[in-house]
C-alpha cells in the first residue's frame, strides 16, 4: 500500500482544502493511505475531521508549528523545526510514507525538503517540474519553474535527465522527447550557456541517456512539440506566468463577449457544451502538483491557492509517482548518465556567481500553473 504524507496546514486555507481533498483521494484510491500532519486542535475543528479520523487508511501525526506563506526560509528551516511541513518530510525520510505533498511556501518547502531528504548523488540542485496543457491533447512537462534562477549547462543536463525519468514513469513513454528552450531552433542561437547545454544534450542523446529533439521556442510548449521542455528557473517562471496571464485574459474576453446582450447570452447557452469542454481542457486545477526532482524522496508541491479538487490532483500525482517507482527511475537514469554528468560538471565554471541557496526557490508561487 502506498502511503502519502500530507502537510495538512499548508496553503492559503490549510485544512479547509486538505481535509476534503484527502477524503476524496482516499475514496478514489482503495490501495492508498494518508498520513495527515498538522495541529490537532485545528484539524479537529474541521467538520469533516471525524470522517478522516475513523477512516482505516488515514492516520494523524501532530505538529505544533505551521510554516506560513510569508515565512523567510531561515525561519522555516531553523526555527520551526516542528512545523507540519517538516514533520511531513520526516515521514518520507523515516520510510513511513513514500511521498509528501504540501501547498505551503515554495521556498521553505524546497529548503526543508533539501535539508531533510538531501539531494541525489550526481545532482547539484533539485528542480521544480510541472505539466502545462498543449494543443496535441496532452501535456508538456516543463522544468525548472523557479527553483534555480541561475543555471550552468550541466544543471540543464541534470534537469533533462530527471525530467525524462518523470515523464517515463508517469506517461509510460520509455524515451520521452526533450526540447531545450531557446530563442530559436538553430544550434547557433542563444547564450553561451544554452549553446553549451545543447551540446551536452546532443551528446546525451547519442549515448542513449536522452531523446533530445533540439532547441524549441516558447510556443512549442503549448504545441506539444516535445514531451519535456528544459530551461532555467528564471525563464521557466516567466513563461509560466505569461501563460497564466494569457489564459486569464482569453477567459475574460470570452465571458465578456457572451455577456454583451441577450443574443450573445442565448448563444452562450447554445455553446455551453463546447465552452465546458474548452474550460476542462485548459483548467489549471487539473495540472496541479509539481514534482521537486533530484531529492532522495518524493515531494510534490500544490499551489497555495488550490481548492480541494486541485489539491486532490496533487495527491494523485504523488500517488502515481510512487506507484510507478519514480524515485528509482530517476536514480537509474542518473546512474546511466553518470559519466556524461561527471564530464559536464568538470567543465562547469568553479562558481556560477551565486550561492546555491540564493539561487533557489525564489518565488513562493511558481510551482503549478495556477493562481
Swiss-Prot record:
Pfam families: FA_synthesis
Keywords carried by this UniProt record: Cytoplasm, Lipid biosynthesis, Lipid metabolism, Phospholipid biosynthesis, Phospholipid metabolism, Transferase
GO-annotated cellular components: cytoplasm
Catalytic reactions of this protein: a fatty acyl-[ACP] + phosphate = an acyl phosphate + holo-[ACP]
Uppermost EC category: transferase
InterPro entries, sorted: FA_synthesis (IPR003664), Phospholipid_synth_PlsX-like (IPR012281)
Molecular functions per Gene Ontology: phosphate:acyl-[acyl carrier protein] acyltransferase activity
Cellular location(s): Cytoplasm
This protein's pathway: Lipid metabolism; phospholipid metabolism
The EC number(s) this enzyme carries: 2.3.1.274
GO BP annotation list: fatty acid biosynthetic process; phospholipid biosynthetic process
Subunit structure as annotated in this protein's UniProt entry: Homodimer. Probably interacts with PlsY.
Functional note: Catalyzes the reversible formation of acyl-phosphate (acyl-PO(4)) from acyl-[acyl-carrier-protein] (acyl-ACP). This enzyme utilizes acyl-ACP as fatty acyl donor, but not acyl-CoA.
Family, per entry: Belongs to the PlsX family.
Protein name per Swiss-Prot or TrEMBL: Phosphate acyltransferase
Amino acid at each position: 500500500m502506498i502511503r502519502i504524507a500530507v502537510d495538512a496546514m499548508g496553503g492559503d486555507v490549510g485544512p479547509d482544502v486538505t481535509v476534503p481533498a484527502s477524503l476524496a483521494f482516499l475514496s478514489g484510491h482503495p490501495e492508498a493511505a494518508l498520513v495527515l500532519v498538522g495541529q490537532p486542535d485545528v484539524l479537529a475543528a474541521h467538520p469533516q475531521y471525524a470522517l478522516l479520523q475513523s477512516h482505516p487508511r488515514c492516520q494523524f501525526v501532530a505538529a505544533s508549528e505551521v510554516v506560513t506563506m510569508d515565512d523567510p526560509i531561515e525561519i522555516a528551516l531553523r526555527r520551526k523545526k516542528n512545523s507540519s511541513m517538516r514533520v511531513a518530510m520526516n515521514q518520507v525520510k523515516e520510510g513511513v510514507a513514500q511521498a509528501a505533498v504540501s501547498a505551503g511556501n515554495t521556498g521553505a518547502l524546497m529548503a526543508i525538503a533539501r535539508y531533510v531528504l538531501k539531494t541525489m548523488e550526481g545532482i547539484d540542485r533539485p528542480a521544480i517540474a510541472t505539466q502545462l496543457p498543449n494543443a496535441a491533447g496532452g501535456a508538456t512537462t516543463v522544468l525548472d519553474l523557479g527553483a534555480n534562477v541561475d543555471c550552468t549547462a550541466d544543471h540543464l543536463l541534470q534537469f533533462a535527465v530527471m525530467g525524462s525519468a518523470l515523464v517515463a514513469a508517469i506517461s509510460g513513454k520509455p524515451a520521452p522527447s526533450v526540447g531545450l528552450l531557446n530563442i530559436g531552433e538553430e544550434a547557433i542561437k542563444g547564450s553561451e550557456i544554452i549553446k553549451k547545454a545543447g551540446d551536452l544534450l546532443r551528446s546525451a542523446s547519442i549515448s542513449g541517456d536522452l531523446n533530445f529533439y533540439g532547441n524549441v521556442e516558447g510556443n512549442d510548449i503549448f504545441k506539444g512539440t516535445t514531451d519535456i521542455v528544459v530551461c532555467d528557473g528564471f525563464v521557466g517562471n516567466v513563461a509560466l506566468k505569461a501563460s497564466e496571464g494569457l489564459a486569464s485574459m482569453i477567459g475574460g474576453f470570452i465571458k465578456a463577449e457572451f455577456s454583451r446582450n441577450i443574443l450573445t447570452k442565448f448563444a452562450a447557452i447554445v455553446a455551453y457544451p463546447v465552452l465546458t469542454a474548452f474550460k476542462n481542457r485548459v483548467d489549471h486545477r487539473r495540472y496541479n502538483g509539481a514534482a521537486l526532482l533530484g531529492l532522495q524522496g518524493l515531494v510534490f508541491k500544490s499551489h497555495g491557492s488550490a481548492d480541494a479538487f486541485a489539491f486532490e490532483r496533487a495527491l494523485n500525482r504523488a500517488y502515481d509517482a510512487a506507484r510507478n517507482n519514480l524515485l528509482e527511475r530517476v536514480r537509474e537514469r542518473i546512474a546511466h548518465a553518470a559519466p556524461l554528468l561527471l564530464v559536464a560538471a568538470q567543465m562547469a565554471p568553479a562558481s556560477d556567481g551565486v550561492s546555491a541557496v540564493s539561487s533557489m526557490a525564489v518565488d513562493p508561487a511558481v510551482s503549478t500553473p495556477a493562481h
